């Protein structure tokens, strides 16, 4: 089951005792899932949702809170409709329901955002407003780099009302217009978790958090592996470059190179991938890695000085891009 469906399924089964919160949820769900239509001179309230559980919850709440019967029509998946949809309609008492839920104001005009009683209600009402909005048009992506909790909104006023409700819950949400559609987005992982709990999807939050932690552990392991690989590549390139410079130094100095420097240089050339510590153990007699490094440094310095005096390519000239690319 996708994360969005898991959240909606859990929210649709949530038991809410507060009448005010239940009313706020119904109002928000109707506002975000549908709208008001004039049919034959009458106001009809409609809401379209993607889960049967959500449609049944909304129908039950409308009847228990307002006493109106709603009819649910099932639109089966076909053609461009990828999944089954559920359309809830209140026709006979549409105007009365719209006024009581605050979707119409006292003058009978549609409210563009969320009604004042929801926006200025209690914290439980703010939670319910988010719950209704998510049940209507919410989505939750899997944890990851682009994880987000989003709600598609019917307009900018509704989006701003939802942002305000999130702020009251201590959650940072942003209103965005994407391809002409208004959305409210929460991207921070901690904020997503907090909002899931606030809405009432605690079980799904635990699943989401577990997946998030697993992904972070994998990402950390991958970063460390990449870091180790990069270090190995750098070390290999450095060893190849050092061996090439030593080879050139031995060419420049010829028979004039001191024996102790020559022996250290030959070790570097013969064992290109070995570390300085390993070269020290291979020396006869064995040396510390600092002693090996010191001798190679003096060998290169001596060769570069001679190359400068004679006007010939120095040891750095042996380190070509092709050489490092093959390392």
From Swiss-Prot:
Annotated TM spans: none
User: What are the alphabetically sorted keywords of the record?
Assistant: Cell cycle, Cell division, DNA-binding
- Superkingdom, according to UniProt? Bacteria
From the UniProt annotation, which stretches of this protein bind DNA? Answer: 275-308
The terms under GO molecular function for this entry are: DNA binding
Secretion signal, residue range per the UniProt entry: none
One biological process term in Gene Ontology: regulation of sporulation
Q: Does the keyword DNA-binding apply?
A: yes
State the protein's purpose: Involved in cell division and chromosome segregation.
The UniProt similarity line reads:
Belongs to the WhiA family.
Protein name as annotated: Probable cell division protein WhiA
Name the gene for this chain. whiA
């Amino acid at each position: 089951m996708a994360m969005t469906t898991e959240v909606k399924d859990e929210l649709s089964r949530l038991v809410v005792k507060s009448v005010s919160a239940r009313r706020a949820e119904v109002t928000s769900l109707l506002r975000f899932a549908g709208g008001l239509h004039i049919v034959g001179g009458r106001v009809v309230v409609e809401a379209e949702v993607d889960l049967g559980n959500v449609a049944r919850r909304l129908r039950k709440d409308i009847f228990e809170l307002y006493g109106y019967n709603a009819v649910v029509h099932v639109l089966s998946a076909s053609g461009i409709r990828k999944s089954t949809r559920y359309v809830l309609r209140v026709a006979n008492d549409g105007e009365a329901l719209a006024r009581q839920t605050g979707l119409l104001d006292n003058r009978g005009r549609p409210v563009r955002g969320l009604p004042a009683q929801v926006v200025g209600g209690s914290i439980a009402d703010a939670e319910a407003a988010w719950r209704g909005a998510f049940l209507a048009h919410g989505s939750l992506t899997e944890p990851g780099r682009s994880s987000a909790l989003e709600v598609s909104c019917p307009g900018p006023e509704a989006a701003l009302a939802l942002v305000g409700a999130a702020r009251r819950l201590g959650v940072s949400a942003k209103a965005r217009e994407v391809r002409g559609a208004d959305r409210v987005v929460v991207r921070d992982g901690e904020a997503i978790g907090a909002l899931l709990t606030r809405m009432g999807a605690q079980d799904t939050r635990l699943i989401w958090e577990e997946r998030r932690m697993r992904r972070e552990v994998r990402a950390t392991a991958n970063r460390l592996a990449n870091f180790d690989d990069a270090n190995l590549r750098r070390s290999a390139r450095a060893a190849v470059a050092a061996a090439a410079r030593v080879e050139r130094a031995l060419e420049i100095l010829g028979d004039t190179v001191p024996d102790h420097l020559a022996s250290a240089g030959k070790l570097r050339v013969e064992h290109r991938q070995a570390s300085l510590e390993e070269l020290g153990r291979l020396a006869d007699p064995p040396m510390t890695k600092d002693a090996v490094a010191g001798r190679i440094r003096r060998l290169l310095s001596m060769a570069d000085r001679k190359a400068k005096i004679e006007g010939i390519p120095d040891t750095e000239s042996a380190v070509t891009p092709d050489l490092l690319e093959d390392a």
